[in-house]
From Swiss-Prot:
GO BP term, pick one: establishment of localization in cell
Glycosylation sites (chain numbering): 896, 902
Keywords: ATP-binding, Cell membrane, Chloride, Chloride channel, Endoplasmic reticulum, Endosome, Glycoprotein, Ion channel, Ion transport, Isomerase, Isopeptide bond, Lipoprotein, Membrane, Nucleotide-binding, Nucleus, Palmitate, Phosphoprotein, Repeat, Transmembrane, Transmembrane helix, Transport, Ubl conjugation
Record protein name field: Cystic fibrosis transmembrane conductance regulator
Record lineage: Eukaryota, Metazoa, Chordata, Craniata, Vertebrata
Domain of life: Eukaryota
Modified residues (Phosphothreonine): 717
Membrane topology: Multi-pass membrane protein
Molecular function in Gene Ontology: 14-3-3 protein binding; ABC-type transporter activity; ATP binding; ATP hydrolysis activity; bicarbonate transmembrane transporter activity; chloride channel activity; chloride channel inhibitor activity; chloride transmembrane transporter activity
SMART domains the UniProt entry points to: AAA
Amino acid sequence: MQRSPLEKASVLSKLFFSWTRPILTKGYRQRLELSDIYQIPSADSADNLSEKLEREWDRELASKKNPKLINALRRCFFWRFMFYGIILYLGEVTKSVQPLLLGRIIASYDPDNKEERSIAIYLGIGLCLLFVMRTLLLHPAIFGLHRIGMQMRIAMFSLIYKKTLKLSSRVLDKISIGQLVSLLSNNLNKFDEGLALAHFVWIAPLQVTLLMGLLWDLLQASAFCGLAFLIVLALFQAGLGRMMMKYRDQRAGKINERLVITSEMIENIQSVKAYCWEEAMEKMIESIRQTELKLTRKAAYVRYFNSSAFFFSGFFVVFLSVLPYALIKTIVLRKIFTTISFCIVLRMAVTRQFPWAVQTWYDSLGAINKIQDFLQKQEYKTLEYNLTTTEVVMENVTAFWEEGFGELLEKAKQNSNDRKISNADNSLFFSNFSLLGAPVLKDISFKIERGQLLAVAGSTGAGKTSLLMMIMGELEPSEGKIKHSGRISFCSQFSWIMPGTIKENIIFGVSYDEYRYRSVIKACQLEEDISKFAEKDNIVLGEGGITLSGGQRARISLARAVYKDADLYLLDSPFGYLDVLTEKEIFESCVCKLMANKTRILVTSKMEHLKKADKILILHEGSCYFYGTFSELQNLRPDFSSKLMGYDSFDQFSAERRNSIITETLRRFSLEGDAPVSWNETKKQSFKQTGEFGEKRKNSILNPVNSIRKFSVVQKTPLQMNGIEEDSDEPLERRLSLVPDGAEQGEAILPRSNMINTGPTLQRQRRQSVLNLMTCSPGNQGQSFHGRTASSTRKMSLAPQANLTEMDIYSRRLSQDSGLEISEEINEEDLKECFIDDVESIPPVTTWNTYLRYVTIHKSLVFVLIWCLVIFLAEVAISLVVLWLLKKTASQDKGNSTQSINSSYTVIFTSTSTYYVFYIYVGVADTLLALGFFRGLPLVHTLITVSKILHHKMLHAVLQAPMSTLNALKAGGILNRFSKDIAILDDLLPLTIFDFVQLLLIVIGAVTVVSALQPYIFLATVPVIAAFIMLRAYFLHTSQQLKQLESEGRSPIFTHLVTSLKGLWTLRAFGRQPYFETLFHKALNLHTANWFLYLSTLRWFQMRMEIIFVIFFIAITFISILTTGEGVGAVGIILTLAMNIMGTLQWAVNSSIDVDSLMRSVSRVFKFIDMPAEESKPPTKSFKPSKDVQLSKVLITENHHVREDDIWPSGGQMTVKDLTAKYIDGGNAILENISFSISPGQRVGLLGRTGSGKSTLLSAFLRLLNTEGEIQIDGVSWDSITLQEWRKAFGVIPQKVFIFSGTFRKNLDPYGQWNDQEIWKVADEVGLRSVIEQFPGKLDFVLVDGGCVLSHGHKQLMCLARSVLSKAKILLLDEPSAHLDPITYQIIRRTLKQAFADCTVILSEHRIEAMLECQRFLVIEENKVRQYDSLQRLLSEKSLFRQAISPSDRLRFFPHRNSSKHKSRSQIAALKEETEEEVQETRL
């Protein structure tokens, strides 16, 4: 970044903003890079500002019982704020005085007032000086206020972030990530722009008082008629504003509904294609869009009338002010012109400035109060450590995640009594609520000496993670004592990767030791992975380590924990995503050897780990079930494996299952209170699942994939699209609605982070607490099938280096000695790297081609524009007729000017009134005829239709695009098109285009009229308009690029916040908060650099426009004064019109810039529409939903791809020849020359290390990748049939389960092919019936938020049911048991045996016992097939499979390998049943 010229700029350069010229010139000539942006002035740096505000806030906290953030802000910023306010007031006063001088100039042309003629020239000079003065005062004042607003925002952002890092886990459990992000996003730039309007709260009333005083002098009491009309108008506009908010609230619910399904579709686009659901999804989204557009139209019409009311009010204000006075007394022309000029200023003050100022204060104070409440939340307390202690001791410790649980239990009991549940269910219900108030850990005691390994085991939700949290100080014990030295290292259950290099992630700010670092990498099996990169361990990882596989992320997290030299290592299920072989090696080399002399606490459920541990602690429902050694365990607790694995026996299979479903379901409804059920009582209590941590986690751990949801639709809740998410107990925020047009929601867009919050955060999200975010795996951990983006699917070794994220900017290399010494300079190369994903290939200024395409996309639009032009020509013609009459009357007037006019009646019809009538029409330049009032409606209506067409085309294009194209895009980027850009096309663009067309026509009309009066003026107008057009073109190139860089600069702020929250426990365990605060300040400074420069260049442009206008006005004033002879009218008309033409022309130029900026959204949408399609499909009927389609009604659509007589495939034989697969065109091959064949009905297991390409092979079968080679099914080659028909041959159970928002029926059968009887039959087969029957509405129960009420196991069963319903002959399973509880796992195994007995099954799996049912195995290593053989052959050779099975397992599974095949098989089956519990690995 370059040094800012502002630092060396002179006073004049600062006053006129000339210091921005170098960047404007550069931006005009070439594309701006981040390195071209100037550094921020030190006064604006986040470090200085946050330190200042933090000091004042601490003072406020210390000195008062009831601290107020506004007081701290006042002490920091008040005097500068007032200084600029006074300058702004002086600038506004000049506007009020101008009409006085104008009146005097007009009076000097009165034939009876010849003595004043001599001073007309001086009055002209005075008038011009007022304009010059206003220009010099106004722009520096507005810029100064913008800057103070920006500084306030930066200081508050920093304070919020610092507070977030200090919050206690209990508080984090109650705050959702959406609330935190909205706390920042809603206030981003709200203060910057709002502060300039804030002063009008006192300026506008003073101005109105001054103007009314001057008008009283002219018109006496009748002046108040005009003011009364304006006040009524302001109230009318406020009423329209409220009406618009009502429509917008209704519509926001529909927008939310549409975006929920769209986001689910984009996230799971691979599943949508695999299931051939493109048409079903398209029709579902389009039907919601239909309803949404009806409400959009209503809101647009209201807003159109609101806008028109302002334009047309000018006529009535003047008319009502002048009319009573004219009827009582005679009126001279001078007074009319002066009144017109006064009324223009008055109208602006009453209907725009004052309401906007009140709205700004209302919004800003609301935001400040919310931030103040947040800053007073409870912070976490670190435990008092004893550095001399060597052992870890816990004595009788009990802890609760929730405070005040007793009260909650009472409420819960009361609540369930109200519901009158039957006795059978009641016991379940209460057993559940007793958990709510139960401690998460009860009376836990243990002691481990230095160097010992303690293994902690237990079923899901037993309190294992809570135990580690307690040792770290994240959870406070309510009784008992904990003792340890305090030097802790921690490895989280869900691997957390910070943006930066692999090396930075492992060292994590600890001093660098080469030998230690190499040992750790070797022990964690990272050497091979790192060697595949050109940059080795200096490769920059994207947000969340998205380019890595789950196993690679897990190993890096473990390496980070091991690298730190600590006394106590807490390892929370570090092996969750590793394959059996890797896990075994790492446990041996890392946990047992490298850390042999360290104290370790390992959470695990593996028998091998328990055997090697010095001590074992088994937890069950928060209590200590067993503590001792492994041999003691075998003697004392023979039933331990059932407690460890979380189930007692398969004998009570169905009862246990039913019980778990009911309790799970009831718990979710009663505690979350946001499911769409009719239990309003629960909603009122608004329990937010504040139970013990184990119970809370059960929800997210059995369900890890849905844990990070972007949107949710909560039925019948009105939502707003402007990114505000209120506290759950607060009513929907009602804006004061004084402002008619309000800030539209198009711009308040959230970060384009892949993991979370892509697109706007919609209000009333399903509450996903921050704690949940920290305890949940990202949706795409350890998978490549159904990956969210190219980056998530590409494994570490294959990721191209271009794909970096915004965060890479400021994740600088950690210094060798200490992570805290971060260089202030941001490396330019990194700045460039950072935006590679996001830089759009759209030219800085919208091309004419885009405009042409937009106008011609709907045939009516051209006619509507012609219609506007015709009406305008009619209006100009009327003006010219009036002008002709005026000249005629004026010439008559000269003849009989002596005629006395006594009658007040005739005075209205004198020559004066012809001037008056004429001016009222064009003079205010917006008082058009009644016809004009409605002329814009067809335009607005047609533009919304265009938006509908574009949305439809874009949705179709995305659904039909090949995966290679979609892989190259970010999920957030695609969703932004459907949220932000479509919102702009619906809301902002139609009215902005209408405003622009209206203003442009007004200017042309006014210029025509003035030129007819005084031809010299036409000569002055032409160069001025030319200068405006050139200035606009010059400025536009730079401003659009700066805006783009600014919006890209927002992403790192939010990405960093979310990243920090996900890894908060790790951060605090390593004490890295100061480093992350520094990184956050860097992100803020980067955004500030772009925003500050944008504000400065904008002021430069506005000031230049004002200067051109002042020069033009000076020229016009002197031309008219020197060339006009006798006659009051002409000078009055010319000067009043000139003042107005320029104001309107400035507005028109600004409006054209807005149109250009908004048309970029159209360019982006066209870019998506032009994406290539996968393959042409058979023609299908176009879909028009009926007028009253609602989401709650089941939408049955015809599936055109299913043929009645379809008998292919019949057997399921599969032949693969020379298959090569790539993720993107021209990328590296992920699989090379794969050839093998599968007999009908055979089961094939895929073996290979994490990231070897097993999931990729399954994707290639479905033609989701760029493939070469050939696959045949039952002799039919994939080239000979359509894609849809090919994919129909497969049933798929993906690793990432896809449940969209809709009914159970819709989720199982989106095309509506099967009747209820068939669906129930299949639900029965896969064990889903008991689940579905628990819900009100059964099959018609609407699932929301990725099926949040279902456990992960239930979702897997849904996928299984889909496959059974599809009657596919080949079944692909991608790690179906990754997160399953043992019961669901057994159901899936049983169903595979029964329902798919005669199908070909291809299985990718980590569990050994699941693989044993396969007849053949395909071993993949280094992108190629290493072996393809039977189980017996693999066990006899030195294969990967043989290495993965420990000798004890081999004995257990294959005791009589030499006996006959049949006997061996039945033996295996029997043994499997017996030993199921021992080998079961419950994924956490």
